[in-house]
Amino acid sequence: MIDCRYYQQNECRSCQWLEIPYSQQLTEKQYHLKQQLISINCDEAQWLAPFQSNEQGFRNKAKMVVSGSVERPILGILKNPNDPQNAIDLCDCPLYPTHFSAIFSILKDFIGRAGLVPYNIAKQKGELKYILLTESIATEKLMLRFVLRTENKLPLIRRELPKLLEKLPHLEVISINLQPQHAAILEGEQEIFLTEQQFLPENFNGIPLFIRPQGFFQTNPKVAAGLYASAQQWVAEFPIYNLWDLFCGVGGFGLHCAKALQEKWGKPIKLTGIEISSSAILAASHSAKILGLEHVNFQSLDAASVIENKNENKPDLVIVNPPRRGIGKELSEFLNQIQPHFILYSSCNAMTMGKDLQHLTCYKPLKIQLFDMFPQTSHYEVLVLLERKKIN
């Protein structure tokens, strides 16, 4: 069991499974996964051993509520948003790398120097709501975001920024996010960059990726790298030359698979990536350019739009990495119709994935693996490779 004083003192119970031995956590998650697939014929599927995480220090991102006073800011959580007296400082949370604690100490000093009054939800007063810190494992560079109510403190922040950069030279991206609403909403739409660099470079398995301020990126780099590595190893076994990556984000799955396929089969690979976020598409396209992948087309569209496009060349492989709601019946039925040889399904919600697999009646699972992206909790991710059933 992790030695966590916050848990022991009942100050933070985010890690609901902290008292369960790690091996038992994996056993229970694997059992839960199999229960979600109980109605799917997995007799021919290869069940790989769960991909394990480090038990602590595995997170590359900290999301800290700011409370307290400008002289003595508290970075952590509010057990009761309407009562700032219940604030818990989580700067020593064992889920973060140990060096994050020293960074938080420097940021507390910066808050005072810049006069960033912590926002008080009950009184609806103050400026600084959250501090969001992300680290690149590949470069050890940092992205720092201040979530503020208004732009009022921007001149003071700019004035104090050189001193902050002296103390934290690894800061690559610094931005202000404006969230003016009096509500427990993490971030607003407007991002003001204080650095020339707007993306944080990361690298998994030799694939350059770029973390953007308002975008999704996995918070457990070791397990994320393992997830992408498994994906590329699984698909590289087959002669696949045309693939779609739906819900592609910054391109992690598609780029890993396209690079591996091109190296294995020695032919150009056509990759089409679909993602609703335009900034994610910019990041994915930049990665493809660095890799020298020429036949790549990342488009800022809703993944459901592929259903309407009847003229696209039919893919050999479709990768889906949907949000928790899954891909749904309509997209599942569309995949049954166009019948790619393979579907690679990555899910953060095995329950909705199980329902989707029931709709994918033309497919059978070949490989299944659990990835423990969120140790100390009941959550996990799963990767399934599906093959089109042969017609007798």
Curated annotation (Swiss-Prot):
Does the record carry Ribosomal protein as a key word? no
What keywords does the record list, in alphabetical order? 4Fe-4S, Iron, Iron-sulfur, Metal-binding, Methyltransferase, rRNA processing, S-adenosyl-L-methionine, Transferase
Gene Ontology BP terms: rRNA base methylation
User: SUPFAM superfamilies per the record?
Assistant: S-adenosyl-L-methionine-dependent methyltransferases
Q: Describe the family membership recorded for this protein in Swiss-Prot or TrEMBL.
A: Belongs to the class I-like SAM-binding methyltransferase superfamily. RNA M5U methyltransferase family. RlmC subfamily.
PROSITE patterns assigned:
SAM_MT_RNA_M5U (PS51687), TRMA_1 (PS01230), TRMA_2 (PS01231)
Q: Which InterPro entries does the entry mention?
A: 23SrRNA_MeTrfase_RlmC, MeTrfase_TrmA_AS, MeTrfase_TrmA_CS, SAM-dependent_MTases_sf, U5_MeTrfase_fam
Task: List the EC numbers from the record.
Answer: 2.1.1.189
Please explain the role this protein plays, according to its UniProt record: Catalyzes the formation of 5-methyl-uridine at position 747 (m5U747) in 23S rRNA.
The molecule here is called: 23S rRNA (uracil(747)-C(5))-methyltransferase RlmC
Q: Which gene encodes it?
A: rlmC
Q: Which organism is it from?
A: Haemophilus influenzae (strain PittGG)
Q: Known HAMAP family for this protein?
A: 23SrRNA_methyltr_RlmC
- Pfam families per UniProt: tRNA_U5-meth_tr
What this protein catalyses is: uridine(747) in 23S rRNA + S-adenosyl-L-methionine = 5-methyluridine(747) in 23S rRNA + S-adenosyl-L-homocysteine + H(+)
